[in-house]
């Protein structure tokens, strides 16, 4: 590759996309600076010179955020970026998924792809720039990569598809789709949608693929100009004679073991065959490398046999038909003190989801590169080791758990009621208790049940299902509700979530070169049938959201005040609002438009806090009459509390009809007296009169007597 700086440009969705090579990170195998609008991402690709002694392809993809990209200094004491944000982890997965299938089988050199976000223009996606940059860094390098690939985001406004929508357009769009692939086929889809029909989603995917073809042609021009010659690598291969011997020893027994229906019994049967073959070679005292090859051949036999059974004999490992869903079972309300809970079981996959309702002050604060500052709906996914009968250290969530949590969040968000209709923060936690495939979709179903149990007025219930594909030449079989073995050994993992009306989320990963439109269309329609079956089951357990919230959930009341009065409610240094909170035990959240949310488990305390706030913001009007309490007495008059937080002065001359020598002769502290507002001066001080009311009363009496005499 030339070491001189070279620049290549193309128009992308009305904004200029520029690629710079030969200036930055020249010691990497491949490096490009992608400029899209004012977004700038440096993408690099490096590889080890020798293959690693592992039985998998060691690829690492990192999407690194830098807060200087949006002119921010990190918070906290250390003042530097720490662990990756959730958004950065999701972006890393987004880039990893389309490039991973495009490395040759048997390639074991360690490869690292790093994209550093250096400048962010919110209207020009840094994730799409990083995906393009990652593909191009690999393509121009000497690393053997069977790309390039490209990605595009697709939105839809008023029925019209848009490529790479701006922030403003995204707010109006009912589809948020990321599609990636090669020039020939799609190999990755990630989407959220507002109950959009399957046919529309398919059209959006195809629309995005047309833009991908254009971006790949652009990359091919750059590779032609600056690309390096690919390095010679030795792909890992097993010994042909050894493979023949192992197959003769294991194939027949493996065929029988694979068809054991129950997961653990099947695993035990397969392991028994494996252990018998490995023991045979251990007795011969062969080298560790040979034993490693034996294990790989056995894995290959299992994979081939599972795929042959599905495509040729139309038999699934657990005996189901291709479109058959495992037995379903669900319950709600199984945890008495939580706000809502739902248990969803599909075969040997089980998820327990818990819904917690909080005040709006419980929103998640986001401090990243995006425009979003907070989040009032969250879905978290946990996958403990006991769910698959294993032991391993209990650590924080990994990339997979964060990805599955985000998928569930995206699937459910379109049906969450607006803040105006339901002023709560909603947090869902899905605990995977058993796993045999499709746990992310089970968590979506469990979360829907939990929210309905909690009384969240969902726009519609959501269910999810995972589809699979096994393709051999021109023959293929689409599988509904894939289990773990079918996911691991198949060619596609296609997750579809939605309501009866349409799709709310899609996630597709392909292990082969890509998929045609026909297969995608068939998979979407088969998924719809499965989704409707699951929805019918869920609605038989709980037909609609509960009318009442849990007694343990906070009750929220909403009121509106004059925005100019917000400072009065808060008080100097928060003194006033903290006093209300201390007195009532409620939570108070105030919006800039004057909307006030008061929340507490105790509704009486909510009402008490509301009354205090109403008194604070209440406007005193000249001419109004109040029954007030004498709070303080001075020589010149008495201070009377009209309502909470508002006092006025009755001057000594306004206390009585006759001349008053001493204030205490008329009123004492604690007395309740009727007063009339006669003036509010320029400083906001309220002047009151008791004398005016006494005079009015006297005049009424005189008028009454005169009327009687007549």
Curated annotation (Swiss-Prot):
Q: Which EC number(s) does the record attach to this protein?
A: 2.7.7.8
Q: Which residues bind Mg(2+)?
A: 487, 493
Q: Which species is this record about?
A: Bacillus cytotoxicus (strain DSM 22905 / CIP 110041 / 391-98 / NVH 391-98)
Record's protein name: Polyribonucleotide nucleotidyltransferase
Give the principal location in a single coarse category: cytoplasm
Cellular localization per UniProt: Cytoplasm
Q: Which family does it belong to?
A: Belongs to the polyribonucleotide nucleotidyltransferase family.
The cross-references to SMART domains, in alphabetical order and at most eight, read: KH, S1
- Domain S1 motif positions: 623-691
PANTHER family noted in UniProt: POLYRIBONUCLEOTIDE NUCLEOTIDYLTRANSFERASE, POLYRIBONUCLEOTIDE NUCLEOTIDYLTRANSFERASE 1, MITOCHONDRIAL
Q: Which GO terms describe its biological process?
A: mRNA catabolic process; RNA processing
Q: Which residues form the KH domain?
A: 554-613
The UniProt entry, under InterPro entries, shows: ExoRNase_PH_dom1, ExoRNase_PH_dom2, ExoRNase_PH_dom2_sf, KH_dom, KH_dom_type_1, KH_dom_type_1_sf, NA-bd_OB-fold, PNPase
Which GO molecular function annotation, any one, does this entry have?
polyribonucleotide nucleotidyltransferase activity
């Amino acid at each position: 590759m030339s070491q001189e700086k070279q620049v290549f440009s193309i128009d992308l969705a009305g904004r200029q996309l520029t690629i710079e090579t030969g200036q930055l990170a020249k010691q990497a195998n491949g490096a490009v600076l992608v400029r899209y609008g004012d977004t700038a991402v440096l993408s690099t690709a490096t590889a080890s010179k020798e293959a690693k002694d592992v039985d998998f392809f060691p690829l690492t993809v990192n999407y690194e955020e830098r807060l200087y990209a949006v002119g921010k200094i990190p918070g906290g004491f250390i003042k530097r970026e720490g662990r990756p944000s959730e958004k950065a982890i999701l972006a890393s997965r987004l880039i990893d998924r389309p490039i991973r299938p495009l490395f040759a089988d048997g390639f074991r050199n360690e490869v690292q792809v790093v994209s550093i976000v250096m400048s962010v223009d919110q209207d020009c996606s840094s994730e799409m720039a990083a995906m393009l940059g990652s593909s191009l860094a690999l393509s121009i390098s000497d690393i053997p990569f069977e790309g390039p690939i490209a990605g595009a985001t697709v939105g839809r406004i008023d029925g019209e598809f848009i490529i790479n929508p701006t922030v403003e357009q995204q707010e109006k769009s009912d589809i948020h789709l990321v599609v990636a692939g090669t020039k020939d086929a799609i190999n990755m889809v990630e989407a959220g949608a507002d109950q959009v029909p399957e046919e529309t989603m398919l059209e959006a995917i195809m629309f995005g693929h047309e833009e991908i073809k254009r971006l790949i042609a652009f990359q091919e021009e750059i590779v032609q100009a600056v690309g390096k010659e690919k390095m010679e690598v030795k792909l890992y291969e097993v010994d042909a004679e050894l493979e023949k011997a192992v197959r003769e020893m294991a194939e027949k027994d493996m065929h029988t073991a694979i068809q054991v229906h129950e997961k653990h019994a099947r695993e035990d049967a397969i392991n028994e065959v494996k252990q018998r073959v490995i023991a045979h070679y251990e007795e011969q005292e062969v080298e560790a490398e040979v034993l490693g090859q034996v294990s790989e051949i056995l894995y290959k036999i299992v994979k081939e046999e599972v795929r042959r059974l599905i495509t040729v004999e139309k038999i699934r490992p657990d005996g189901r038909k291709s479109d058959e869903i495992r037995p379903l079972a669900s319950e709600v309300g199984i945890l008495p003190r939580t706000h809502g809970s739902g248990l969803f079981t599909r075969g040997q996959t089980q998820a327990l989801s818990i819904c917690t309702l909080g005040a709006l002050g419980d929103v998640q604060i986001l401090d990243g590169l995006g425009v979003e500052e907070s989040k009032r709906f969250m879905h978290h996914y946990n996958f403990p080791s006991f769910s698959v009968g294993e032991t391993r250290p209990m650590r924080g969530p990994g990339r997979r758990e964060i990805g599955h949590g985000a998928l569930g969040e995206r699937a459910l968000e379109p049906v969450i009621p607006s803040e105006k209709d339901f002023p709560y923060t909603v947090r869902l936690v899905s605990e995977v208790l058993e796993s045999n495939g499709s746990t992310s979709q089970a968590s979506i179903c469990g979360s829907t049940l939990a929210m309905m149990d909690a009384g969240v007025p969902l726009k519609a219930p959501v269910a999810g299902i995972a589809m699979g594909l096994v393709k051999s030449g021109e023959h293929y079989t689409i599988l509904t509700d894939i289990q773990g073995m079918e996911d691991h050994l198949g060619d596609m993992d296609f997750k579809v979530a939605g309501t009866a009306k349409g799709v709310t989320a899609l996630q597709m990963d392909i292990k082969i070169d890509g998929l045609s439109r026909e297969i995608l269309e068939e998979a979407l329609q088969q998924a719809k049938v499965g989704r409707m079956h699951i929805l019918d089951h869920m609605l038989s357990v709980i037909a609609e959201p509960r009318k009442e919230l849990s007694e343990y959930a906070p009750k929220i009341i909403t009121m509106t005040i004059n925005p100019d009065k917000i400072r009065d409610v808060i008080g100097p240094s928060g003194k006033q609002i903290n006093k209300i909170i201390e007195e009532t035990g409620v939570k108070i959240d105030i919006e800039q438009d004057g909307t006030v949310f008061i929340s507490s488990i105790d509704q009486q305390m909510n009402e008490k806090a509301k009354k205090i706030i109403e008194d604070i913001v209440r406007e005193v009007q000249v001419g109004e009459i109040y029954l007030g309490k004498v709070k303080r007495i001075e020589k010149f008059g008495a201070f009377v509390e009209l309502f909470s937080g508002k006092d006025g002065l009755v001057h000594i001359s306004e206390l009585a009809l006759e001349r008053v020598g001493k204030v205490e002769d008329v009123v004492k502290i604690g007395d309740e007296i009727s007063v009339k507002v006669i003036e509010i001066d320029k400083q906001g001080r309220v002047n009151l009169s008791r004398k005016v009311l006494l005079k009015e009363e006297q005049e009424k009496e005189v008028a009454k007597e005169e009327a009687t005499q007549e």
